[in-house]
């Protein structure tokens, strides 16, 4: 939708326009970081357009909170590292931006894995590459680097991220398959696909593409076969907060 102060955004289109430090693109995951990026914008001695992606689902999210101290001290964090894990125990680093972080965080708490670090990219452009590479050096035992996004593979930030990091780390994507439209058109299909992304990040999926680059080809766009599978599992109303918990989709 569109209103007096906002419009629906296509992240990949804004990122295509980024060059020569012409604009700033941010996707904040905490109230304090949102506050500080606005504060920084006004405080700076120069003016460059600031694009901020702010999904409505985080407005009242129980995990999306900041303390008063977070507002009154510090500044905008271009990258937020995972402080809940021991770097030497991590063998997989997942990079992401935006609200999908909270879905992965919820699953990470359930799994209590301890071997997966989730790093949030809060500023997409200018991309803080040196800062990110410095953070990644902490994870010396990590060989698997993932970019996780809920958008289709040809949308979102994936292609932008890949072009920046491909020469430095071997990174692969977990996302929806490439699509001509940003939405599936089916709420059931959307929820299953969303959970499938989380399952693949935490290796709960036994798809043969699990250890390869995943663009959810195991589901694809096979609407009829998908609807039949839903009927086989007697799935009528799907709770987005629950796992699909069924046989792997084919």
Task: Give residue ranges: language-model regions.
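Conserved thiamine diphosphate
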Residues: 1-44
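General beta-strand structural signal in soluble alpha/beta enzymes
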Residues: 25-29, 52-54, 147
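Generic detector of short, locally flexible boundary/turn motifs and exposed helical patches
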Residues: 15-19, 55-56, 109-114
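Short acidic/polar capping segments at secondary-structure boundaries
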Residues: 31-33, 56-58, 99
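Thiamine diphosphate
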Residues: 1-10, 44-47, 59-248
């Amino acid at each position: 939708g569109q209103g007096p102060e906002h419009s629906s955004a296509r992240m990949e289109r804004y990122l295509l326009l980024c060059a020569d430090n012409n604009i700033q693109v941010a996707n904040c995951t905490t109230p304090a970081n949102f506050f500080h990026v606005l504060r920084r914008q006004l405080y700076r001695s120069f003016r460059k357009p600031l694009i901020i992606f702010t999904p409505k689902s985080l407005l009242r999210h129980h995990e999306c909170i900041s303390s008063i101290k977070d507002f009154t001290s510090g500044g905008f964090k271009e990258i937020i590292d995972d402080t809940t894990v021991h770097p030497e125990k991590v063998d997989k680093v997942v990079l992401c931006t935006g609200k999908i972080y909270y879905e992965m965080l919820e699953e990470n708490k359930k799994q209590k894995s301890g071997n997966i670090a989730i790093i949030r990219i809060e500023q997409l452009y200018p991309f803080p590459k040196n800062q990110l590479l410095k953070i990644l050096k902490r994870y010396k035992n990590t060989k698997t680097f993932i970019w996780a996004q809920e958008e289709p593979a040809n949308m979102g930030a994936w292609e932008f991220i890949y072009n920046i990091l491909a020469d430095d780390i071997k990174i692969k994507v977990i996302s929806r398959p490439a699509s001509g439209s940003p939405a599936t058109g089916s709420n059931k299909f959307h929820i299953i696909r969303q959970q499938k992304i989380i399952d693949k990040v935490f290796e709960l999926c036994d798809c043969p593409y699990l250890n390869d680059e995943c663009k959810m080809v195991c589901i694809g766009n096979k609407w009829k076969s998908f609807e039949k599978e839903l009927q086989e599992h007697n799935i009528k109303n799907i709770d987005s907060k629950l796992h699909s918990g069924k046989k792997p989709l084919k």
